[in-house]
Amino acid sequence: MKIGCVDVDGHNWPNLCLMKLSAYHKGRGDTVEMWRPEGWYDLVYKSRVFTDTYSKDNIYIANADQIIRGGTGYGPGPDLPDVVEHQRPDYSLYPQFPDTAYGFLTRGCPRACGFCIVSGKEGRRSHQVADLSEFWDGQREIKLL
């Protein structure tokens, strides 16, 4: 399968979900790349962290058999399946961010800020969801999300 990835936010920060989906599909032998308007894709993932107040989804895709949209920017929805969630991210999807690892050690937040959906989606208690070894492979920098 040929898989395309669209980072709808595209604001100088890699999309962790897309990197995990890329790793999953590459592990199955699929070809994965950032989506381009030319060519044809079997499947395109559009991932969005922020809502319209920050990132408008003006990306029209007409060159794919199937399009899957996901992420908090599209509202509540299903979580990634565990087999994808616990993949080591495919950092090659974002070569402009070399030698940096990205991931979550915990989920949830006790603060419940009005502008943020995290406490409503993930709970008001912080709980461990991963070990550092799940997303770090010796990179010089680690960014915890």
Residue ranges and their predicted role:
Residues 1, 41-43, 61, 101-106, ...:
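Conserved Radical SAM active-site core
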Residues 1-69, 75:
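A short, structured N-terminal alpha-helical element that caps or precedes a catalytic domain
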Residues 28, 36, 46-48, 69, ...:
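Arginine residue identity/basic-tract feature
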Residues 38, 92-95, 134:
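Short boundary motifs at domain starts and secondary-structure transition points
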Residues 55, 90, 128-131:
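General structural signal for secondary-structure boundaries
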Residues 61-122:
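Catalytic core of nucleotide-activated saccharide and alditol-phosphate transferases
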